[in-house]
Amino acid sequence: MTQMASAGGDTSADNVGAHGGRTVAPVPYELTEAAGPLDRAELAALDAWWRAANYLSVGQIYLMANPLLTEPLRPEHIKPRLLGHFGTVPGLNLVWTHANRVIRQRGLDAVFVAGPGHGGPGPNACAWLEGTYSELYSHIPRDGEGMAALFAQFSFPGGVPSHCAPETPGSFHEGGELGYSLLHAYGAALDNPDLTVFCVIGDGEAETGPLATSWHGNKFLNPGRDGAVLPILALNEYKIANPTLFARIPEPELINLLEGYGHEPIVVAGDDPGVVHQRLAAAMDTCMNRIAQIQRAARDGADGSRPAWPMIVLRTPKGWTCPPVVDGDRVEGTFRAHQVPLPAARTDDGHRAVLEQWLRSYRPEELFDDRGRPVPELLALAPEGDRRMSANPVANGGALVRDLRLPDWREFGVEVKTPGGSTHEATRVLGGWLREVTRLNPHNFLTFAPDELASNRLQDILEVTGRDWQAEVGEYDVALDRSGRVIEVLSEHICQGLLEGYLLTGRHGVFTCYEAFIHIVDAMFNQHAKWLDASAAVPWRRPLASLNYLLSSHVWRQDHNGFTHQDPGFLDVVLNKKPEIVRVYLPPDANTLLSTYDHCLRSRHYVNVVVAGKQPQEDWLSVEQAAVHCARGLGIWEWACHNDDPGTTPDVVLACAGDVPTLETLAAAAILRDRLPRLRVRVINVVDLMRLLPAEEHPHGLPDREFDTLFTTASPIIFAFHGYPWLIHRLTYRRTNHDGLHVRGYKEEGTTTTPFDMVMLNDLDRYHLVMDVIDRVPGLRETAAGLRQEMVDARWRARAWTREHGADIPVVADWTWPEPSR
């Protein structure tokens, strides 16, 4: 290690490599005596753990052999591609070291979140020192052989990623994309009263939008019910190539900012290891005492006022303990330490010599015996069993998840005597069922919404709970509750992040959002799906409860809000992910929505996206019919078909997916039955979009033979779809009759208008569907030309009516499904 610039780093050994300029190796240091809570022995022990973790971290980045430096480093000992990020690692290892101290002293149940997740070598090193790595990966024992394997696998083909990942013991936070650490930490703490989450936030990460809003997470943490989060802002001043904003504003301004977010920040700063150890130990003690005081007061019946939670601002150098100077450029304490401080260690003799000196500066001979095992004094520093942060079962939430108690959805269904004979708001019906789900599961189920719970018609949930709210309550506020089971905040990032943290630590939840604005969390969905994908391949990870979206206020019923609110493209984003992970459902009415959501809340390790309407909509299927239809995922609606010669191939297939497309398809089918009674029409409704894929492409996919039986091999298919038309083509391009498939859907035509004008703008309306049938069924262009002209005229009249009256024409607005005369 280096003494840092103030300690005379330039007195270290110099090496001049082929790259030119001086390269300065770090040297071992003596611990400075400083005031603090640590006695000499404890200070030395903590520093030994920190040195060991740093040594193991550097080894992971550079070495593929000779882990204990039993011989001078040679080129073949160095990896040919040096990948990783050392800059943040010493800070992560430092926090882990001191977290272990308070865990042991206080018997804490704690987990660790590495916001600068690209510092993956640090948590890997600590998990190996704690023994968890070897317990989970028997081929990586806690000795020299295991150390060599730990080093060799890092950022290496067939190995482990450079950042915290599902493969990392003790991690439930993916470290690839920055910004979500604090939200995951708060989500983990919800309903976990005994849990402490040590959350390290990178100062670069703190510049991201999601992290910037994450500080408000403490407004939803009830100290009487929930655990605690200790945010630690790692202020090492630099990102990849630039300084960080938080490091370059005056400290009083930073403190005022953090206090404004509801924290009591404690600053720990320095570049002398002995001094920093003492300061950080003192800060940890203060924070743990304050957290215990807050929780004790709340659980003893205090007035419930929102506390100011403690946090730590840790200001230490970027790449602390790495070579101070490389090829004449300052590295330690600068942006140059972000990734690999010695980039030419394999090919440059000077870099390689300095790498060896760097590794030896940690004095590994004091830390590991001659067989590479951590010395007993080091092992004694780790907590025991599940108290080890790398072994805490909370970080493997699938091992803790329990089935929800779910009421029978059939008891909440609506009566359907005849198809289309009644109307209901589908999501309002679902809200009644979710009310009971909430009541039956008061400790492991939460609903999240960005101020849209009532707008999406789920307000019945508030009959049994309130909105979680720890801030001030005004005279006219309603349904706010310190222990509420609904979290509403106008930030999709907060909703998604808290829910992810809640799910990753073994619980269940629902996120309801306007369809167009769920795009705000596209990237968060993407990262969570990747976590599910990767964790499914890790044998010791257990399946999590699914991430369940309920998207409403959707594209076809945002006619009043206009173009900005009209976007069904989240479905396209979701279906880019692996079929083993994602599911998309488009229930056409209230009963199918109930059946679908019952299935989703029972499922494991998926992302379920359900799109449903909140406006009054026709009820098509009874409870019994809905159960069968949803189990199939798609099927022929015989009552809507028309074929005077049963057993013959239909002349045309009308397919639909989504509530509004279903309505328009059935209206088109009624017109065809009335006006072209000899035309054989088959109506197919699709609830589970994955059924359109081939069986070999998705677990829900239909075999080709079944698909051809339903959709035929030659008849035209007119498919009315909720989203962008090309998505259906993506799903069906390998099917026999794909050339006969014509899809209508949203084609980015929108404005503030009426519901029917919206579908007309996108050629999804009943009249245009009839025109599509006439255009594509052989012979109809000639024989049904008059009907086609009527459809053109009907569209014109409908649009003219909206321009004159500001509402849809009654023949459309008052339409109901006609009972067949036969």
Curated annotation (Swiss-Prot):
Q: Which PROSITE patterns match?
A: PHOSPHOKETOLASE_1, PHOSPHOKETOLASE_2
Q: Which Gene3D superfamilies match?
A: 3.40.50.920, 3.40.50.970
Family matches, as InterPro entries: Phosphoketolase, THDP-binding, Transketo_C/PFOR_II, Xul5P/Fru6P_PKetolase, Xul5P/Fru6P_PKetolase_C, Xul5P/Fru6P_PKetolase_CS, Xul5P/Fru6P_PKetolase_N, Xul5P/Fru6P_PKetolase_ThDP_BS
Q: What is its EC number?
A: 4.1.2.-
Q: Is Flavoprotein set as a keyword in this record?
A: no
- Transferase as a keyword of this entry, yes or no, is no
GO BP annotations of the record are: carbohydrate metabolic process
Q: Which domain of life is it from?
A: Bacteria
Q: Which NCBIfam families match?
A: PRK05261.1-2, PRK05261.1-4
Which named protein is this?
Probable phosphoketolase
Q: What species is this protein from?
A: Nocardia farcinica (strain IFM 10152)
